Structure formats: C-alpha cells, structure tokens
C-alpha cells in the first residue's frame, strides 16, 4: 500500500466498510425487534425505541407516502400489501427500505438485505471492565 498522507488510513475508494458496535444487551433488543439501529452522522449512531423511530420518520425532511406507510406499520404492525400484489415479504422490504432511507434500520433487513453484496462478520468481546460488546461489520466491494 502506498502512503499518500501521514497518519491517515487510506482505502480503495470503491470498497465499502461499516461497523455497528454496541452492548450485548443492545444487540439482543435489536434482534428481538425492541429497538432499531439509528445511523445518522449528525445525531450519532445509537439504538432507538419504536417511538423514537416513528418520531424520526415523522420529522423527515423527505417525507413521502412511503414514509407514511412505514410510520403506520411501526405504529400498528399491520401490513397493507395491496400495493405489492399481496406479497407481504415485498411489502415489508419496501417499508424497511424506506426506514433505511431515513437512517432507521430493522435488524434482519440490515444484516441480510441492506448490505447483501458485502461480506459480513459478527464478533463478541469482553472489555477489561467486564462489559460484553458485539461488533457487526460489513465490508467489500458493492458495485
């Protein structure tokens, strides 16, 4: 690797890297659907409740009818698949895509669909202070 700037890690610009780090309990809640992962550089990365996710969607600068469908789904967990030839999986995917457009991620969608063309890795670590943390990484070329 050629060093271009000192004290800066340079990577191939066509590669993608992302990482979610949280406590084991945060990940358990995310996997169970009790919280959502919120990834916005302005507000910081964090896990948020369903109510906070609804609030983020309601206050979106780019709110559309699809955003309203996502809000309705989060509020009621009722799914209207009529726009998707009654295919509930396709309807859910569209809702989760709209949530992702607003930086709100449901666990299964984030892990299995959002970065579907990237390599994934998940690991658990114990900190020196005794806390258990989990790390979820996606990396590779997405092009």
Regions found by a protein language model. Give the residues of each.
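Short, extreme N-terminal segment that most often corresponds to the first beta-strand
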Residues: 1-26, 137-142
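Intrinsically disordered, low-complexity, compositionally biased regions/tails
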Residues: 17, 26, 37, 48, ...
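Charged, amphipathic alpha-helical linkers/stalks
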Residues: 29-49
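Low-complexity intrinsically disordered segments
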Residues: 46-140
